[in-house]
């Protein structure tokens, strides 16, 4: 497997010239202005207090996500920010409100004019290197609406708690992705019959040399799926920096751990990938989950997390809200699954005792979430316990409780929101 070079020349697509340039991307003048007041009271040899350290970090952190708006911080380094649920009331999540997920702290600036995608491996006949312009012009462009969802979305809702980024319900976003089919690009290399998996690497990296490079692989059949893309546009615009500029992998129906950002390297392999992020991380027990999606990476006890599970979310109500009982209340939400499509979404206003059908909105494709709507006509005052449950076309319905697993993946239990009518 090709290693990332320790140093890059200035004409390369990205540089690790300094921590501020590589990750924080802050404007030097703004940083000095923001941090000068904090540092002014310190003597030359005085150790900064925790409050001072936090203030300096705040000066660094407020700049990097200036292209984003209103996100909920989960961690600074690596940058992990989730989307407030209120932004899920549109078909496509606006780019500036789209969640941010990284495993590494160094997110380099990339010059798209110099960016190159290298394709190699022991299971191809002809290695290939592509510029962004070649990628955009030499292959047919396609669009697909698809939900990008972090494997650990809703992790904070597991009880007992599990370790990891404590995501709420906002580590996801629905977008219209434009790019080229991965299978078309790889066809130009002459894939050998020995090909088993294809691995992907991006430009981000860890602070320490010992940090495992974030690399993921896919089984060949998923790679050759016509819906798997290398995307360079998101909702009609070039990919935002924090969502993978200039090109990223799109794997509809699978969790976002495979959607490699800042894509730089693809390797077609005749053997299973054996790196940390495949053999140790992002794995779930076989008990309680469907197996068979990634056979070359399965063991007797566990397997990689792959396909999304059927799920739904109420998007315009919050727990404890108060409404007048004199008028109807519109309840909105979204539902999704691995790509079979949503057959129905039901809603209960009495804590699950009775259920009624909601009205499904326009279908933007089987990998997009499906919006739904329900008009609640109050019959009494007091508490209403609102629940929603989705059923896929394949007949799978959301469970009452999630399947427990060590890493807090696939939380798809029924959501309950209590509102008061007066």
Regions found by a protein language model. Give the residues of each.
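Structured, non-membrane catalytic/scaffold regions adjacent to prosthetic-group chemistry
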Residues: 53-422
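N-terminal secretory signal peptides
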Residues: 1-27, 52
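Short, cationic motifs built from Arg/Lys/His that form the positively charged side of catalytic pockets
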Residues: 28-29, 248
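Enrichment for repetitive, rod-forming helical segments
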Residues: 11, 35-36, 41, 108, ...
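N-terminal export signals
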Residues: 23-24, 30-52
């Amino acid at each position: 497997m090709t290693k990332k070079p320790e140093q890059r020349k200035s004409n390369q697509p990205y540089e690790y010239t300094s921590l501020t340039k590589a990750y924080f991307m802050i404007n030097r003048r703004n940083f000095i202005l923001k941090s000068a007041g904090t540092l002014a009271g310190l003597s030359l040899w005085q150790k900064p207090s925790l409050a001072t350290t936090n203030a300096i970090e705040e000066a660094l952190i407020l700049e990097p996500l200036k292209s984003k708006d209103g996100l909920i911080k989960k961690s600074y380094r690596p940058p992990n920010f989730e989307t407030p649920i209120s932004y899920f009331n549109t078909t496509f999540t606006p780019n500036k409100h789209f969640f941010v997920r990284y495993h590494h702290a160094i997110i380099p600036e990339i010059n798209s004019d110099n960016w190159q995608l290298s394709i190699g491996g022991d299971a191809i006949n002809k290695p290939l290197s592509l510029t962004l312009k070649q990628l955009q012009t030499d292959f047919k462009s396609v669009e697909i609406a698809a939900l990008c969802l972090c494997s650990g979305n809703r992790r904070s809702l597991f009880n007992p708690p599990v370790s990891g980024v404590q995501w709420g319900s906002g580590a996801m976003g629905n977008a219209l992705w434009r790019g080229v089919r991965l299978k078309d690009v790889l066809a130009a290399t002459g894939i050998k019959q020995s090909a088993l998996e294809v691995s992907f690497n991006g430009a981000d990296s860890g602070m320490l040399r010992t940090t495992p490079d974030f690399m993921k692989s896919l089984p060949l059949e998923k790679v050759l799926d016509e819906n798997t893309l290398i995307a360079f546009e998101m909702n009609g615009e070039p990919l935002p920096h924090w969502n993978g500029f200039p090109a990223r992998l799109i794997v509809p129906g699978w969790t976002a751990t495979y959607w490699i950002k800042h894509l730089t390297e693809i390797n077609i392999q005749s053997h299973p990938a054996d790196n940390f992020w495949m053999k140790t991380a992002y794995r779930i027990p076989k008990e309680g989950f469907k197996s068979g999606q990634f056979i070359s990476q399965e063991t007797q006890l566990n397997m990689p997390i792959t396909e999304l599970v059927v799920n739904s979310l109420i998007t315009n109500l919050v727990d404890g809200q108060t409404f007048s009982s004199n008028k109807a209340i519109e309840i909105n939400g979204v539902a999704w699954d691995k790509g079979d499509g949503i057959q129905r979404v039901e809603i209960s206003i009495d804590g699950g005792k009775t259920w009624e059908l909601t009205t499904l909105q326009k279908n933007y494709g089987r990998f997009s979430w499906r919006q739904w709507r329900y008009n609640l006509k109050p019959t009494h005052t007091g508490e209403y316990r609102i629940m929603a449950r989705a059923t896929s076309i394949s007949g799978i319905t959301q469970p009452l409780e999630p399947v427990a697993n060590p890493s807090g993946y696939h939380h798809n239990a029924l959501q309950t929101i209590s509102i008061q009518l007066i």
